[in-house]
Each structure stands twice: as structure tokens, then as C-alpha cells.
Design a protein with these regions (language model features):
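Conserved nucleotide- and phosphate/pyrophosphate-binding catalytic cores
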Residues: 1-87
Length: 87
């Protein structure tokens, strides 16, 4: 993905995370799969961008387990940091 599409994906992901009232593996997976479809990205591209933004790595334990363990506040902080790096 290029810089613009990565920025858009992460910005939409940040909005999504902010809107979630439940932050568990199943809710996260369902929400992010729907987001990928809505913004026209493959799950591979979206999930890869989120993984790198949140963990700094290309390979991690299962993404949604990782997000749930990190928690909403930490995930939001890391997404915002990644967005700042892209601007």
C-alpha cells in the first residue's frame, strides 16, 4: 500500500476503534472485516497496516487477540502515533 492509502486505512481504523464500546477479539474482527469491505481494501492490506502501526512488527500473534490485550486506549495511542508519522 502507498502512503495515502495507508494513512486513510489507519485514520478509518482510529475512528472505528473510538466508536467501539466492546473491545474483544470477536467484536474487533467483525468490525475490522466490515471496515475493509467498506473502504475497499483487502483484509490483508488493512490488517497488515494495523499490525505494523500498533506493534511495529510485520508478524505478531493473532492480530485481534493482540489488540484486545493491548486495550482500546493503547491501540488508539499507537494508531495516532502512526498517523502522525505519516503526515
Amino acid at each position: 500500500m502507498d502512503k495515502e492509502s495507508t494513512f486513510r486505512a489507519l485514520a478509518e481504523s482510529e475512528k472505528l476503534v473510538q466508536s467501539l464500546t466492546t473491545f474483544d477479539k470477536i467484536t474487533l474482527e467483525d468490525a475490522f472485516r466490515a471496515l475493509a469491505e467498506r473502504i475497499g481494501l483487502t483484509t490483508r492490506d488493512l490488517f497488515g497496516s494495523i499490525r505494523i502501526a500498533v506493534t511495529g512488527r510485520t508478524a505478531t500473534p493473532p492480530l485481534f487477540d493482540t489488540l484486545a490485550v493491548l486495550g482500546k486506549d493503547r491501540v488508539l495511542t499507537r494508531l495516532k502515533f502512526a498517523l502522525d508519522l505519516l503526515t
